[in-house]
Amino acid sequence: MPSTTIHTFSDIDFDSPGKRHYELAFHHDGTWGNVLVPLTVVNGQRGPGRTVAVFGGTHGNEYEGQVAGWRLSLELDPAALAGRVILMPRLCTPACDAGTRESPLDGVNMNRAFPGNPRGSTTYRIAHFVTTQVLERADVVLDIHSGGRVLRFPFCSSFHEVPDAAQEREMAEVARLFDTPFVMIYAKAMASGLLTDEAEAMGKITIGTELGHGEATIRQGVRHAEVGIRNVLRHCALLAGDLENALSLIHI
């Protein structure tokens, strides 16, 4: 999968029809000098529409979102799409490479780093890019998490209570598209600096998930993620077709 290395973020083409793969270079005073974070932009050829942003690998030891996001970056066909999809399947790339929750470069938890800092350490600069370049463009934000090494959740999608009733109603509707046994609603913020909190505060339709656990990639969790994301694209009229049921696609 050929990609273009980007050192100046204004060189990213977010608008032309087609699919483009990038590696975003964030300077780091290490052996290779840069951390390369993958980003894929898919602009549909069926016309304008909403923008859906998909994140995996916010924590590096949570694998289901990384697998689902990477597959979708390869499979989504611009000819079948309206609107735009932005995918960052390995958001905290240093943590993904190391299989750790926090980045080994600066010890920072990406999901406590938002809205980021353009002059901070690597994790804060990645978070700042996401806030200013991706969330600003998005209408719908999907942050795919799982339990990682130490937590075990039932499969669930999630969102937070927000002051805007219309925003919360659509989030409740979208959360059900992942066809998980549970939808978890956070009554208050669990911490500061979350990607989902930042997106919700910007008025975006924002959904998180917990889709796996342990030192493995859970197949059913990947399917919930893949089918859920595609269902969201159908809900938003980016893709045509009927909604899928995640569990019906699991072959035991």
Where are these regions (language model features)?
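Structured catalytic-domain cores with a bias toward divalent-metal coordination
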Residues: M1-H251
